[in-house]
Amino acid sequence: MIRFLQHSEINPEKWNQAVRNSLSPNVLSEYELLDLLTGDDTWHALVQDDYETVMPLPTRKKGVLKYVYTPFFLPQMGIFHRQELPQYKFDLFLEEVSEHYVLADLLMNEQNTWDWKKGLTPYFVSYALFLHLPYNELYSQFHENTRRNIKAAQKQQSQVTLQEEKVADIIALFRNNRGQGENVHFRDDDYTRLQRVSDYLLEHNLLEVYGVRTAQNELAAGALFVKDGKRRWFWFSGRDNQLSETKPMFLLLDTYIRDHAESDLELDFNGSNNPNVARLYQSFGGTRYPIPFHRVYKNKFWRLLLTIARKGSMQ
């Protein structure tokens, strides 16, 4: 039986166990982190039986209308299940979502690919790199241009730091550079939320902080990697555009891969809709995989109404 639970009805311990024991565990979808990621909003959930299968539903309101959204800095959501989930059960979860919301934008996870395999749903793309090989073998899989950029960065005599940079400085790098682009929609509250989540992750030894400083000790780039079991999320990064000629991000990622080579870890580049960023991830030997996206409407009336409203807002 699938139940809709309000936030206050969710058992935190059972929730976390369900996510951790699923086929697609994700520390950022655990109870405490969902609380931080949703901030002033909230989240509810669909729960099957005694937390055998769970689905988080971050919730916002526009007027009297409730809808599900994907919070910034949450790489994947979807349905968390311990065993293979049949198509009909997947459909039941989506139908249950439509019973409670007029609209739901659902970013799934790599185990929720039924409709994607049939070509019935759009998807985002991510890249993952298994780090079990020796560094030299991993390096040999980098694209030629990437190896060239790494060598150029090494000639700059920049230094890579570990757990020395402040998260706030890396956030500022992004905010003052790429964050000024018209396609970036982060608000002040989003940056504040990112800092709070980072503080929690640091406190629980779940965050690796890498930085690159030039020969003049200027912070050229920084990145935050989330430790999630055997997965490492390339979660957030920033770069100083004025120091881009030093190729700091190439040096940073190369160093991270070198540091973690010959381990049972997987580096997940966390995807990007920016084709230039996606090419960067692929150039480090990452393997492409899909993250399905579902848009669920309460009924045909709401689908038509919301489609008209969206078109009107674009004019």
Regions found by a protein language model. Name each.
Residues I2-D49, M55-V64, N109-S244:
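A conserved beta-strand-loop-helix scaffold within acyl/acetyltransferase catalytic domains
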Residues D41-W43, E99-L103, L207, E262-D264:
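Short, high-confidence coil segments that cap the C-terminus of an alpha-helix
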Residues K61-Q76:
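Conserved acyl-donor/pantetheine-binding loop and adjacent beta-alpha core of acyl/acetyltransferases
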Residues P75-Q83, Q242:
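The substrate-binding groove and active-site-proximal loops of carbohydrate-active enzymes
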Residues P86-S126:
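Non-catalytic accessory segments adjacent to catalytic cores
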Residues D105, T161, E266-N270:
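Short catalytic-loop micro-motif centered on adjacent basic/acidic residues
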Residues Q111-Q156, S263, G271-Q315:
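Terminal substrate-recognition subdomain of acyl/acetyltransferases
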